[in-house]
Structures are given as structure tokens and as C-alpha cells.
Regions:
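Membrane topogenic/interface segments and analogous intrinsically disordered interaction regions
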Residues: 1-273
């Protein structure tokens, strides 16, 4: 006697029109993005090792030129046996992060894009394309004022005294100065982004201009610990200019949004001439 097995009705796979991913899928995606970023950073760090000596000589050039102008010689010291090796590793890591930045920045962007709306994607892409050139411009400005800071700091050393410079501390000082100024140049872009997202209005940003200028001056004073007026002004002026430029862009954006809202709420004939 043959028995016919009851067949269970096939369940169709549920469609996901919103494009949402499960937690496990997110973790797998994150793992893949991190793995690709790590490979790019490791390869770039290996390349950075071969140029680390050239980078160190380039970083040493400003203080050597200042010392030569004063009839002195600048010598960077390594207080430990492995100090020179550790410094080259640190330089290689920094160079590797910079060289691999297009890869790991893209991986971050590719991970975030599926969860963004079209509007957020447009604003985010505009922010990235604007922030990256400004960041490198800020780094260049920090490198430009660095010799002035070195010259002023070393001028406090008497003629009968000598400065023993720790190479690692010197490198970290240069790196922090360049990065801090680079980040400062990007801050106005954050203001524009917050305005486009509807968090801050253009007039609200403009009304805080006195506080902003005071904060910028204090920031440049901290970024240039020598308290050199020339260096402070060289850093403060472009940041202040970028702040007011951000205010102008935000105000223009608010006006465009207001006009669109008027057209949406009423007919064109209702608009003022």
C-alpha cells in the first residue's frame, strides 16, 4: 500500500522592499570592509617604511634651517636604543594611513551608503569632496607656520646653552600641529552640513561670529604654543574667512529653502513681487 506523503506548502521568501539588512548581515559587511581596509593599510605601511627616512629628513629640515641661520647645529636625539627604530615605525604607520586613506574612506562610505537617503547621500558626498581638500590645505598651512614656531621657541635658548631635542617628541609635535590645523580648516564645512540638515540656521551661525572669532583666536594660540603673533594671524585669518564663507553659504541655502516652501504652500501669484 502506497501512502502519499503530505506536502507542505512552499513558503515564499519574504521580500524586503526597504532594503534592510539583518544584524548578522551588517556584521558580515562590516567585517569585510574592515578586512579590506586593513590589507590596504598594511600594504601602505610597508611602502611607508621605505620612505620613512626621507620623511624624517624632510621634517628635520625646518629646524636645521633655523639653526643654520643662527650659526648653530640642530641635532635630534634618541634617548633609547630602539628609539630610531620606533620612530621609523611611527612614521611608516602615519604614511600608511595617509596613503591608504582613499581605500578605507571608501570602505566607510560604502558601508554607510545603504542606510542613507538620497538627500543624506548627496550632502555626505558633498561634505567629503569639500572637506578633504580643505583638510590638506590646513595641513599645508600648519606646515607653513611651523618654521616660525621653531624659530621663536629656539630663540629662548641662550648663546651659552644648547637644546637637546628628543626626535620622537619633535615628530609628535609637528604631527599634532599639522593635524590640528587641518581639522580646524574642516570645521566650517561641519557648520554648512548642519545647516543643510536643518540643525542650524544661517543667521544663527552668523549671530555667533564674535564668539567664533574669539574661539578661533584661542584655538590658534593653543595650536601655536609659542604665542607668535605672526603665526597666530597666519592661521586665524584663513579659518575666519572660511567661517564667514560658511555663514554666507548657509544663509543662501536658507533663502532657497524658504522660496521653495513659499512655492509649495501657495501659488506663484501669491508670492511678493
Amino acid at each position: 500500500m502506497t501512502s502519499v506523503a503530505s506536502k507542505k506548502p512552499r513558503t515564499k521568501r519574504s521580500k524586503n522592499p526597504d532594503g534592510r539588512m539583518s544584524l548578522g548581515s551588517h556584521l558580515i559587511e562590516l567585517r569585510n570592509r574592515l578586512f579590506k581596509s586593513a590589507i590596504a593599510i598594511v600594504v601602505a605601511c610597508i611602502a611607508g617604511w621605505f620612505v620613512s627616512e626621507w620623511v624624517f629628513e624632510s621634517l628635520k629640515a625646518p629646524i636645521s634651517e633655523v639653526a643654520a641661520s643662527q650659526g648653530k647645529e640642530a641635532i635630534l636625539n634618541f634617548p633609547t636604543i630602539a628609539g630610531a627604530f620606533d620612530l621609523r615605525l611611527q612614521i611608516a604607520l602615519t604614511v600608511g594611513l595617509v596613503l591608504a586613506s582613499p581605500v578605507w574612506l571608501y570602505q566607510i562610505w560604502a558601508f554607510l551608503v545603504p542606510g542613507l537617503t538620497r538627500k543624506e547621500m548627496k550632502y555626505g558626498l558633498g561634505f567629503i569632496l569639500t572637506a578633504i581638500p580643505l583638510f590638506f590645505a590646513g595641513c599645508a598651512a600648519g606646515w607653513f607656520v611651523f618654521p616660525h614656531i621653531v624659530e621663536l621657541l629656539t630663540s629662548f635658548t641662550g648663546s651659552d646653552a644648547a637644546s637637546f631635542l628628543d626626535a620622537k617628541i619633535y615628530y609628535e609635535f609637528v604631527l599634532k600641529l599639522v593635524l590640528v590645523v587641518g581639522i580646524a580648516f574642516v570645521l566650517p564645512v561641519f557648520l554648512v552640513l548642519l545647516n543643510f540638515l536643518g540643525v542650524l540656521s544661517g543667521m544663527l551661525i552668523l549671530k555667533s561670529w564674535r564668539l567664533a572669532i574669539m574661539a578661533i583666536v584661542l584655538f590658534t594660540a593653543v595650536a601655536t604654543p609659542a604665542a607668535d603673533p605672526i603665526s597666530m594671524f597666519l592661521l586665524a585669518i584663513p579659518i575666519i574667512f572660511l567661517f564667514f564663507l560658511a555663514c554666507g553659504i548657509a544663509i543662501l541655502h536658507d533663502r532657497r529653502v524658504a522660496k521653495r516652501q513659499l512655492v509649495f504652500d501657495g501659488s506663484p501669484s501669491d508670492l511678493p513681487a
